[in-house]
Amino acid sequence: MKRNRFAASIAAAVLLVTVNPFAQGEPASGQGRAIITVLTKHNEVSPVVRPQDVSAKVDGKEAEITGWAPFKAPNDKLELVLMIDSGARNLGRQFEEIRSFVQNLNPGTKIAIGYMENGRTVMAGPLSADHNRAASELHLPAGPRTNPYFSLSDLAQNWPSHDSDARREVVLLSDGVDPENRRFDPEDPYLQAAITDSVRAGLVVYTLYWRSAPGGGNSLVADGGQSLLSELGQATGGYNYWEGTGNPVSFQPYFSDLMRRFDNQYGLAFAAKLNRKPTIEGLKLKVEGLVQVTAPQQVYVHLPGAE
């Protein structure tokens, strides 16, 4: 991993242009990084956030900010996987909006479409900046319903790239329900495993609620699925999109918000005390100014070179 020291004398304008967002400073006993989304409250152009405006606590203890910079050219690499639930066979009417979203991503964004099958994420093609090609790989899922959290864990453990400088983000289209266990459990072990795997892999997971059951299904089951999806999004620094427990008329407002989030993200690198083996810890981030900040609730802390 590249290691740069943020010198206090460097002008903010130079910092914003030249620093790799995930660059690390001098390590303490442990280090980590995260993707942070910074928006204004009324959709204005987001302000520049300087390193001195940011503070963090990891595991309840003050952490040293060793890197903070926006994802702007030339350091704006984004790898995005659109995951589609194997039960979403009623999704056909939304395909035009999904294709448009894929085709209108920023030119440098690499995207792939994955389908949940038998506890795995089956990729329709490689991560590619050819958005028209990726859009052409969109089709209705064919396999039986599977646990979405199994599939997410598989994706996190087998991310289709080794570019450590790129953002890794996921748009997960699902109702969040395990077909083998439809009872809501806030400590669902498969969800917790998916969160751990995603945090360790540095994934930001956005969830788009899409109800696969015809006729609406059971509202208690739907509420439970949404709660699990919400927990997943909050833990990884993503966002959760839904309209009640029914399917949205249009995905367009969601896709517009996603585009805005992709364009307003920062790379955070930090040093924190690590008294044992690499671990998942809680993150509390504070950013000065009138901004809305979305940060992961959990981060992976590890020894230098032990990612």
Residue ranges and their predicted role:
Residues A23-E307:
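Scaffold/interface architecture of coatomer-like assemblies
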Residues A8-T18:
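Bacterial N-terminal signal peptides
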